[in-house]
Amino acid sequence: MKNFKMTIAYDGRKYMGFSERKGNPDKAVQGKLEMILTKMYNTYVEVVSACNTEAGVHAKRQIVNFIAPEDTYDCDGVFEYFEKYLPDDIIILSVEIVDERFHSRYLVKSLSFEYRIWKHNAPRRPLFERHQVNVLNQVLNVKK
């Protein structure tokens, strides 16, 4: 059995977060990945993430891992299989085989988050960034 580490990115607008929602795997990034792995290996394969995200949150470089139940695919094979079946709003940036003890959640060393806020009455509305910002209609209390 191989332990695969993948770095992924996604546009979270259509998802209720990374973690699978019971009975509704299409609404979570984890659910999408696990559905593809289930198809790939003909058995359920769990995807573990370094962190969970909330609804609508995007990821630029999120680390996940899974244990392949058989040695059918190498890194290129895994990458190509995901490329074939992933929706346009999720991409695989890299795939590598790691030590069997690697666990993306328990071995995470750091997390970073970027919050982008647009003040509603600012001089110009963001055009290209409009799906990556939160619109704020009230005064932001930075001290709080």
Predicted region positions:
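Structured-RNA-binding interfaces characteristic of tRNA pseudouridine synthases
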Residues: M1-K144
